[in-house]
Swiss-Prot record:
Broad EC category: transferase
Cofactor needs: Mg(2+)
Subcellular location: Cell inner membrane
Coiled coil: none
Name of the protein in its database record: Adenosylcobinamide-GDP ribazoletransferase
Keywords: Cell inner membrane, Cell membrane, Cobalamin biosynthesis, Magnesium, Membrane, Transferase, Transmembrane, Transmembrane helix
A Pfam family assignment: CobS
Taxonomic source organism: Treponema denticola (strain ATCC 35405 / DSM 14222 / CIP 103919 / JCM 8153 / KCTC 15104)
HAMAP family (alphabetical): CobS
Gene this chain is encoded by: cobS
Length: 260
């Protein structure tokens, strides 16, 4: 339970007044629960969407957006703004890292944040009747973040990034990878919170593996860009990956339903 509580305390703003030592052992445990935390956040964000009348979907979508910002403390969105500011500055590594650490936000970061917030609001206000997709997208996006911590190198030799890299377990990633691939096969049922309708045909369900595949391809691309720009990964870059892959999973699901 220490890992779960620490994950809640670090990755959400849910008030839990329990003192957990922030050490390598407990951090390792916390990463086992990271994808679960993503699903939990998405589930809580669903409450206004699912229980308010559909005719008020624009209002419930806005409330859900505010709830998401509150639950996460904008921890990942902060990384979106910082990363976009740094990467679009066309500077050398040291200057890019300096820009990313600057608490002020620049023009590129402001534009990027507004785009991400708009896309998230659009998803929240149009996702009915596939609201359950938010939970699957939340899980997959945090799995992408876990992949970054496990398999990429930090851009700096100090700080939380290095501690996380040392603490994260490959087993936790592969455990969740298998589970996510299994869950993806049941995307229609998860989306609608329903039982299997008709006969389950595995070949027809394989298309839903595009959901985690899209997330991992995007993750790989951003990692390569980050290596080229700053020689590794920072928490800000990981925040961008989490936000981007969540939106990508939702968009990919829409594409599958319409075209495949």
């Amino acid at each position: 339970m220490k890992g779960f509580i620490l994950a809640l305390q670090f990755f959400t703003r849910i008030p839990i007044n329990i003192n957990i030592d922030f050490n390598e052992k407990n951090i390792k445990r916390a990463f086992y629960f990271l994808p679960l935390i993503g699903g939990l956040i998405a589930g809580l964000v669903l409450i206004p969407i699912y229980f308010l009348p559909q005719k008020y979907i624009e209002i419930s979508g806005f409330i859900s957006l505010l709830l998401y910002l509150f639950l996460t403390g904008s921890i990942h969105l902060d990384g979106v703004g910082d990363t976009i500011d740094g990467f679009f500055s066309a500077r050398k590594k040291e200057k890019i890292l300096e820009i990313m650490q600057d608490p002020r936000i620049g023009t590129y970061g402001t534009i990027g944040l507004n785009v991400f917030l708009l896309l998230r609001y659009i998803n929240y206000s149009t996702i009915i009747p596939d609201a359950g997709l938010l939970i699957l997208a939340g899980i997959i996006s945090r799995l992408s973040g876990l992949a970054v911590v496990v398999f990429s190198k930090p851009a700096k030799d100090t700080g939380l990034g290095l501690l996380f890299h040392k603490s994260a377990s490959k087993f936790s990633f592969f455990f969740w990878l298998v589970l996510v691939c299994f869950l993806s096969l049941f995307t229609p049922e998860i989306a609608a919170f329903s039982k299997i309708q008709g006969t389950f045909i595995l070949v027809e369900r394989l298309k839903y593996l595009l959901l985690p595949l899209t997330a991992f391809i995007l993750t790989f691309i951003i990692i390569r860009i980050s290596y080229k720009k700053i020689g590794g990964i920072t928490g800000d870059v990981n925040g961008l990956i989490v936000e981007l892959t969540e939106l990508a999973v939702l968009s990919t699901s829409f594409f599958i339903n319409v075209h495949l």
